[in-house]
Amino acid sequence: AAGGESEDLFEALRGLRKQLADQEALPAYIVLSDKVLHLLSISRPTTIEEFGEISGIGDYKKKKYGKDFVKLIRQFVE
């Protein structure tokens, strides 16, 4: 189902990032950078392992945010 970037997915990812950032009173870019969000909306990882392979996502972010982002991406891919 890949084929370029999904604008809708990118916006949804931004929304989720803001929600997670607000919960911790962090700037959004600390959670994940825009570059990473673009990569996510293109590659659309549907497992936490795949999420962790995205450039810019380390082990810490994979464990901390993987579940939420993967869940959102799955809703778009199905």
Question: Where would I find each of the regions flagged by the language model?
Answer:
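Accessory DNA-binding and partner-docking regions appended to nucleic-acid-acting proteins
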Residues: 1-78
